Amino acid sequence: MIKNTNYFGIDISKNVFDVTGSDGKHYQFKNDISGFKKMLSLTNESSHCVMESTGVYHLRLAYYLYEKAIAVSVENPLSIKRFIQMRLTKIKTDKSDSQMIYEYAVNTSDELRLWKGQSPTQIACSQIISLTNLYTKQTTALKNKLQTEESMGSPCSQVIRSLKRSLKYLKNEIDKLEDSLLKLVKQDNQDLLTRVESIPGIGRRSSMLLIVLTGGFERFNKASELCSFAGLTPMIRQSGSSIRSRSRISKMGNRRLRKTLFMCSLSAKKYNKACKEIFDRIVAKGKSKKVALIAVCNKLLKQAFALAKSGLKYDRNYRSVLNNLN
């Protein structure tokens, strides 16, 4: 990073965003173009704005600053929370979130990754996945409604026909969207898609989702960063000198990625040799199958990351090579 960098910690919500700069002052602006211009007036060529990934709320400001040649980093909320918990033990609870993000930026400056936004193809892929998920939820709701209606003594034929038409329509739309997604992913990541898809337990649809949701795995330098992004890393709570409570996954990461991996784990625990060994070993220790499946999710993600970074295709006989890349 540039010497004498002027850092800004930015906490963004739907309507406003709070800012803390190196001068210690606090600002609050509207999360719209008028607020963006006021934020820009605080910056110069040595400024570096750091914010959390907040779904979609951060995107407009991040793109605005990026287009104005201001350095931007969009960090995993879990990374910031852990930093505060582990290293800033003297931090006071009355500090604003933007101030804590500022302190995170200053103390982890060498680890901050510059944000470059998404390409038009990546944006289109993300939008397709979002709409596909919406249609999938609607399909589930309609199927439940159809089942309820058909279980009635005298179901209305018009209602039944309407529900079936809607289900057919949604299925056709989902199929079209997934075909479009496949074409887009192949444009930039044909080789990566083939490699990720070679992992037992990860099918084509899941491979596409993994590639899109991780930005082709390019946003991560370590597998541990990727697992943290997915919210699969354990979180242990501790208060004072009290005994630590049972660890659990954070669930603060990308829910869509975590759900995709969990569905893959159900197959991987049977057909992926390394995953099966992990699953069987954990269950044999008396731990729950859910804990074992989470471990399988971690393993799958690490395998995908290793293949993405190494250029290798999955081969159970080369597990040692893959492990060295984890």
Give residue spans per PLM region.
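Short hydrophobic alpha-helical segments that form membrane-spanning helices or hydrophobic packing faces
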Residues: 206-212, 293-294
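Phosphate- and other anionic-substrate recognition elements at nucleic-acid/protein interfaces
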Residues: 1-158, 270
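Helix-hairpin-helix/helix-loop-helix acidic hairpins
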Residues: 148-205, 214, 269-272
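A residue-level signal for conserved active-site and pocket-lining positions in enzyme catalytic cores
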Residues: 101, 135, 261, 286, ...
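Short helix-capping/linker segments at secondary-structure and domain boundaries
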Residues: 108-113, 142-143, 216-219, 268-274, ...
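Low-complexity, acidic/Ser/Thr- and charged residue-rich accessory regions of DNA metabolism proteins
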Residues: 241-242, 279-326
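Generic structural signal for well-ordered, non-transmembrane alpha-helical segments
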Residues: 133-136, 140, 165-175, 298
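Phosphate-backbone recognition surface of nucleic-acid-processing proteins
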Residues: 29, 34, 210-285, 289, ...
